[in-house]
């Protein structure tokens, strides 16, 4: 426990919290342009082909972002919106692409959890 005199001499240092998504620079989302769209495999013990994109952001960063959902329409030079959120079994992937925003289309035929995949409410059939 420091004395009052020690605190007068040098105040207590604040512990700085390290952000998990530095490329967003304190913004909820960021716009970017896809520089490469490719697939990759997860680390053990999982097995799949995950769709990811390399994105150059307006903040100047180049990041790897995950493309959620079944099927996508992204290609090089597509303008996308990214949010934070890592993919646990893909090392280095700390961002998600938001479906249904800018050039990214929603997931076709999705009826549940639609808001997360950019799908409008289907027309009620008679």
Curated annotation (Swiss-Prot):
* Primary localization: plastid
Q: Where is the composition biased (Basic residues)?
A: 111-126
**Domain of life, per lineage:** Eukaryota
**Which stretches does the entry tag as region Disordered?**
104-126
Q: Identify the Pfam families for this entry.
A: Ribosom_S12_S23
Q: Where in the cell is it found?
A: Plastid, Chloroplast
Q: Name one GO molecular function term.
A: rRNA binding
SUPFAM superfamilies in the record: Nucleic acid-binding proteins
GO BP terms, alphabetized: translation
Keyword terms: Chloroplast, Plastid, Ribonucleoprotein, Ribosomal protein, RNA-binding, rRNA-binding
The role this protein plays is: With S4 and S5 plays an important role in translational accuracy. Located at the interface of the 30S and 50S subunits.
This chain belongs to the protein called Small ribosomal subunit protein uS12c
Q: Which species?
A: Phaeodactylum tricornutum (strain CCAP 1055/1)
């Amino acid at each position: 426990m420091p004395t009052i005199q020690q605190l007068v001499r040098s105040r207590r240092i604040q512990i700085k919290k390290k952000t998990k998504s530095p490329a967003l620079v304190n913004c909820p989302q960021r716009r970017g342009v896809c520089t490469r769209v490719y697939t990759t495999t997860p680390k053990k013990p999982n097995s799949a082909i995950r769709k990811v994109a390399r994105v150059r952001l307006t903040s100047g960063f180049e990041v790897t972002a995950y493309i959620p959902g079944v099927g996508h329409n992204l290609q090089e030079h597509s303008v996308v919106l990214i949010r934070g959120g890592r993919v646990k079994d893909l090392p280095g992937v700390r961002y998600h692409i938001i479906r249904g925003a800018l050039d990214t289309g929603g997931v076709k035929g999705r009826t549940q959890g639609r808001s997360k995949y950019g799908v409008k409410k289907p027309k009620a059939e008679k």
